[in-house]
Amino acid sequence: MMFLMIPYGAVIAYSSILAQEKGLTGVLPYFYIFLVAGMLVSKLSTQKIIDSGRHKALVYGSLAVLVVTMVSYLFLSTGIHLLAAGFFFGLGYGILQPLFQSFVTGTTPAPQRGVANATYMLSYDVGIGIGSLLMGCLQETIGLPMGFALTAIAYLVGGLVFLSYVDRYYRKLKNAAQ
């Protein structure tokens, strides 16, 4: 989860500066409203897919949405684009965050769930911190739009970690439980 939170830390910490650079400060409060709306839509629409066992489709679909959203910051020029980016950013995280939380709780024995959740939340916080720090370093040299686009690499790394380790581990534990 740490890799997936790096762009989140960058967006939350620096979207107001980017909006100011682009002359879109009047739209910025609505960016956060659209971000939350995307999260709400994801919560309402994905539970049936999770219950049907198609978690891989959700993971890769939301990662694709998030990669496209972050790369789209390179072309940010209108308030509508900023609002759409907020919505799709929220949609992607609204799917991933609870899905990975369920992986943690669903594969950990009950006595160890507190430790597992604490580790999960620590990776969450570390990723946000790295994202904020990284964007602070990048903004002066390459600019915020390119910096936001480059954070999409963290999603690709997170997707590779999921593909090579997390999904296999999750399926192994689920099969052992049945």
Write out the residue ranges for each language-model feature.
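Structural signature of the two symmetry-related core transmembrane helices
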Residues: 57-72
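Extracytoplasmic gate region of multi-pass secondary transporters
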Residues: 1-32
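Helix-to-loop junctions at the C-terminal end of transmembrane segments
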Residues: 42-54, 139-140
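A membrane-interface helix-boundary motif in multi-pass transporters
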Residues: 137-155
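Helix-loop junctions at membrane interfaces in 12-TM secondary transporters
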Residues: 74-85
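Loop-to-transmembrane helix entry/capping segments in MFS-fold secondary transporters
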Residues: 25-26, 110-120
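Multi-pass alpha-helical transporter architecture, strongest
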Residues: 151-178
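Intracellular juxtamembrane helix-capping segments at the cytosolic ends
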Residues: 95-108
